[in-house]
């Protein structure tokens, strides 16, 4: 076995350029060509907000960035310490007019966000001040205003970020709740990429051993041992990848928001509930049935979890074609929601329902409302109008709450139940392994998983080892495509991703 391992090591050195070249390219030729072309220009943009503020940050990146220091601050590159703020007069490069007093920071390549020479100007945030400096930068030869996401694109093309880190950065900029921020910061700092790189390395190692066996494994005893070891390694990896896929899309829910539909009969308090949760009157509340006819949506932060709350039309029989369209939309919202809150009038509902399980209560109410019931779905039952009943309401189910939208009685208890349900539906970014956060990532992981399955099928059937090796190569390529460190066949995905950033990022 010692001799066989020596042969494997020798083969790894001899064949690294041939066997692994296609699966380990960081960038395609077209990407490198575009990277070269983007380096010819120096870009600039306002990176802070466009509204009036105390301080604004203007970012410059590209080969001629040093000209900003020379011509607009009257300094030489040698006189400024990298990454140290220096207070200077900022002037027009043509006529020397004073534009502002501000801080200048110099980031020489490759130690910058973009990997290029970069400059930051921290100036007063008045609109006229910023406009004058932007106009002055346009006067410098080879300078142009950056496109949306172009700074991040250059960072990616320079190898400063991989595709998952770019996605994480985009999510971080869009994060509206604490749990979204936590998930995004983990991805932006490379935790998800680290997981995928580990998988890819494991596959490449198995590829090397399989190739060595094909070339040198004449000994049948050694061959059986190697194939068994490979089979075990890939089976373990397949189980890990399968668990990663079988996450109930919690990472994507956290990223995009949990869709919550409020359903029930007319006048049970659905609109009152959305108003009390949003702390403003977003829906019309009326004693007349059929007031709500269309879906009313609002995005909320509940305990750090993002939700899209949908108020729907009261479910009943109607001959009004407009109301019937609202009823159709209500049923559609319920069928596509991640969580359905069924609102009932506790003052008129039968007390025996309280003895049933949450799922059974939800099923019976859905049947009564002529609404499809999903046994695998997620439901909360809310008994409203607690102020109208004189008897105490005893609830034994964690997913059943009682409150009065009129007085607020029971609201805190309902919010606790709602937060618990949201925690089940979403990930806990601080306690769990990194999760899939986009359909792009999920697609590549699914395809990689199928290739691992095909590899195991070939080995179990004692099939062609060359075909088995090809399945590993394809699986490694799919994993590499998630971080875009595999061979990239198209750049459309990257273009769409970078365009989602704002100007100046």
Show where each model-derived region lies.
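Inter-motif core of Ras-like GTPase G domains
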Residues: 325-347
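Generic enzyme active-site microenvironment
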Residues: 309, 343, 382
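C-terminal-of-GTPase-core extension/linker across diverse P-loop GTPases
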Residues: 39-50, 178-301, 318, 336, ...
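A glycine-rich (often HGG/GG-containing) alpha/beta subdomain
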Residues: 2-4, 11-182, 186, 190, ...
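Conserved nucleotide-binding/hydrolysis micro-motifs of P-loop NTPases
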Residues: 51, 62-64, 108-112, 126-129, ...
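Short, Asp-centered acidic motifs that coordinate Mg2+ and/or phosphate
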Residues: 307, 339, 380
């Amino acid at each position: 076995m010692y001799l066989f391992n020596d042969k494997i090591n020798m083969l790894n050195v001899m064949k690294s350029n041939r066997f692994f070249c296609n699966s380990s390219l960081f960038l395609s030729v077209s990407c490198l060509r575009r990277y070269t072309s983007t380096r010819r220009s120096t870009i600039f943009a306002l990176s802070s907000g466009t509204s009036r503020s105390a301080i604004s940050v203007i970012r410059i990146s590209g080969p001629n960035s040093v000209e900003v220091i020379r011509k607009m601050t009257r300094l030489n590159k040698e006189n400024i310490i990298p990454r140290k703020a220096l207070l200077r007069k900022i002037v027009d490069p043509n006529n020397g007019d004073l534009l502002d007093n501000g801080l200048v920071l110099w980031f020489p390549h490759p130690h910058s966000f973009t990997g290029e020479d970069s400059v930051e100007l921290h100036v007063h945030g008045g609109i006229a001040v910023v406009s004058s400096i932007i106009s002055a930068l346009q006067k410098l030869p080879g300078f142009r205003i950056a496109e949306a996401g172009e700074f991040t694109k250059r960072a990616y093309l320079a190898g400063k970020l991989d595709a998952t880190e770019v996605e994480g950065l985009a999510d971080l900029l869009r994060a509206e709740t604490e749990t979204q921020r936590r998930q995004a910061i983990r991805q932006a700092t490379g935790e998800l990429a680290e997981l995928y790189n580990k998988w890819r390395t494991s596959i490449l190692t198995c590829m090397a051993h399989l190739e060595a066996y094909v070339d040198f494994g004449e000994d049948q005893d050694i061959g059986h041992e190697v194939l068994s070891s490979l089979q075990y390694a890939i089976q373990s990896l397949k189980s890990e990848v399968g668990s990663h896929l079988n996450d109930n899309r919690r990472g994507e829910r956290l990223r995009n928001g949990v869709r919550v539909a409020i359903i029930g009969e007319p006048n049970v308090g659905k609109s009152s509930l959305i108003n009390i949760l949003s702390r403003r009157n977003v829906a019309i509340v009326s004693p007349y049935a059929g007031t709500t006819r269309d879906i009313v949506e609002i995005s909320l932060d509940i305990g750090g979890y993002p939700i899209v709350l949908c108020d729907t039309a009261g479910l009943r029989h109607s001959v009004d074609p407009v109301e019937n369209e609202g009823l159709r939309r209500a049923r559609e919202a319920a069928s596509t929601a991640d969580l359905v809150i069924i609102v009932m009038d506790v003052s008129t509902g039968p007390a025996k329902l309280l003895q049933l399980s949450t799922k059974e209560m939800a099923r019976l109410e859905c049947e009564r409302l002529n609404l499809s019931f999903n046994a695998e779905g997620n439901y909360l039952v809310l008994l409203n109008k607690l102020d109208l009943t004189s008897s105490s309401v005893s609830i034994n189910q964690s997913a059943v709450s009682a409150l009065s939208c009129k007085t607020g009685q029971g609201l805190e208890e309902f919010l606790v139940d709602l937060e618990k349900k949201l925690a089940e539906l979403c990930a806990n970014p601080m306690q769990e392994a990194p999760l899939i956060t986009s359909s792009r990532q999920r697609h590549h992981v699914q395809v990689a998983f199928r290739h691992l399955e095909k590899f195991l099928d070939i080995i179990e059937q004692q099939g062609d080892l060359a075909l088995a090796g090809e399945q590993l190569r394809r699986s490694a390529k799919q994993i590499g495509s998630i971080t875009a460190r595999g061979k990239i066949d198209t750049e459309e995905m990257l273009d769409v991703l970078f365009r989602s950033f704002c100007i100046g990022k």
